[in-house]
């Protein structure tokens, strides 16, 4: 039996650690390429804005907002401002924000990682910035492929990310608990946070 088939059979039992010991799902489905097999966000890794590989297991026990960002979008100002505010108010409660620059929508994130980091510093960003990625298509980062197929990560009219600043709320176990469209400002997430802290 292939590892992929085994993981698909066991996934209902392992999903988000429902019946598994912590880390077991990651042991079973450790291949970064077999993203469908993952049971939580914590099984992935991504390069930060400085190019260092980050194991997302570091977010175990934290509530996370994962979003794609762009510097030249009409929604940039409101999203960066509100994300910075949410992080400032709730970081001590266990909120973490993971921002992934993406140039797939109107080519509104054309800069280098260094330029994006400098832009974000203008908003006094203290949350975690990652290297530029794709969120749709064959070249999409495995984390984003995985989030889009989760029961509470699916979109309206298909699972593809529609635009900049699509946001996913992730619980302490690394499970997607809600997806917010690009027109929903970060402040709407605030009402959902207390349920997961």
Swiss-Prot record:
Could you tell me what reaction this enzyme catalyses? a hydroperoxy polyunsaturated fatty acid + 2 glutathione = a hydroxy polyunsaturated fatty acid + glutathione disulfide + H2O; (12S)-hydroperoxy-(5Z,8Z,10E,14Z)-eicosatetraenoate + 2 glutathione = (12S)-hydroxy-(5Z,8Z,10E,14Z)-eicosatetraenoate + glutathione disulfide + H2O; (13S)-hydroperoxy-(9Z,11E)-octadecadienoate + 2 glutathione = (13S)-hydroxy-(9Z,11E)-octadecadienoate + glutathione disulfide + H2O
Matches recorded under Pfam families: GSHPx (PF00255)
- Does Oxidoreductase appear among the keywords? yes
Sorted keywords for this record are: Cytoplasm, Developmental protein, Lipid metabolism, Mitochondrion, Oxidoreductase, Peroxidase, Phosphoprotein, Selenocysteine, Transit peptide
Q: Tell me the GO BP annotations in alphabetical order.
A: arachidonate metabolic process; lipoxygenase pathway; negative regulation of ferroptosis; response to oxidative stress; spermatogenesis
Q: Which residues carry this modification: Phosphoserine?
A: 40
Cellular component GO terms, alphabetically?
Answer: cytosol; mitochondrion; nucleus
Concerning InterPro entries, the annotation shows:
Glutathione_peroxidase (IPR000889), GPX_AS (IPR029759), GPX_CS (IPR029760), Thioredoxin-like_sf (IPR036249)
Q: Which GO terms describe its molecular function?
A: glutathione peroxidase activity; phospholipid-hydroperoxide glutathione peroxidase activity
Identify its protein family.
Belongs to the glutathione peroxidase family.
How is this protein organized at the quaternary level? Monomer. Has a tendency to form higher mass oligomers. Interacts with FUNDC1; this interaction promotes GPX4 recruitment into mitochondria through TOM/TIM complex where it is degraded by mitophagy.
For this entry, the protein name equals Phospholipid hydroperoxide glutathione peroxidase
